[in-house]
Curated annotation (Swiss-Prot):
SMART domains: MR_MLE (SM00922). GO terms for molecular function: magnesium ion binding; O-succinylbenzoate synthase activity. The active site is at residues 134, 236. The keyword Lyase applies. It holds the Pfam family MR_MLE_C. Its EC number is 4.2.1.113. InterPro entries: Enolase-like_C_sf, Enolase-like_N, Enolase_C-like, Mandelate_racemase_C, OSB_synthase_MenC1, OSBS_N. This is o-succinylbenzoate synthase. Disulfide bonds: none annotated. GO terms for biological process: menaquinone biosynthetic process. The gene is menC. Its cofactor is a divalent metal cation. Converts 2-succinyl-6-hydroxy-2,4-cyclohexadiene-1-carboxylate (SHCHC) to 2-succinylbenzoate (OSB).
Amino acid sequence: MRRVTLYRYSVPMEAGVVLRNQRLKTRDGLIVRLQEGERLGWGEIAPLPEFSVETLAEAESAALEQLQSWVAGQAFSDALPPSVAFGLSCAQAELDQHLPQAADYRKAPLCSGDPDELFEMLQAMPGEKVAKIKVGLYEAVRDGMIVNVLLEALPDLKLRLDANRSWTRAKADGFARYVAPSLRSRIAFLEEPCKTREESREFARETGISIAWDESVREADFRVEAEPGVSAIVIKPTLVGSLARCQQLVKDTHQAGLTAVISSSIESSLGLTQLARLAHWLTPDTIPGLDTLDLMQAQVIQGWPESTLPLLAAEQLDVVWQS
């Protein structure tokens, strides 16, 4: 006997979370609970505004159609919006006990704001020092100066930077001018510095600063391949699609000799813990990019270890549909 519950959550965000052109006041998504006999499987469907191709309403419509078919004994379709494909495939994998329980709860802290506070936090970080900084929000020159100061002050620090394609080539060069050439190798990667792939490639070749593909991974013409100056592929399952698609991307990335990084699209704690399990399974040697929980004011159903945020139980969520 197959049974389904589809829930909707809406969690208030901390002030100041801006996605491209809009301030995100709440994080809204769907939680799927599959049941077959005694077995349970959970999944999260949470398109990210400004980044996902599908809206939450479109995702809900697609999920409802699939879940009704699933209850009737059908398998989930392969042709689904990415967030729906990811959430349903996670729930199915949990149900079938194919998603390992072991998780990688290490996270590259997402840093923003005051360089002095940043310095104190990074200095106190145990083990491998890897942090992520969003660049491109302020002046490129300021970004370059902060990166340079941090790398100079903390000799064992590696930085992951993310520009979200926000720079012209001239601005990207302005950033690079303020990072000493001797420190550039400790930038693990800079995600998509320029507005076009070709400009980003040229930037990497000419500055010696490694880049990573992120937005490009979701474009129809993208192929994983080794090329000069590219060191990593950032995989955001909510934006990419099913577990099978993520597995294939990781495999292709490793075969090309590149680093694969599993990364968050600001999922709830339930989705984040599943991403931590996925990272432990598929990319055990790489710290995942999952430091987004503190952007929210509550957790959902499954808590993240050591988080003190309040936890919403399933009973506190709205039920969209139940079989």
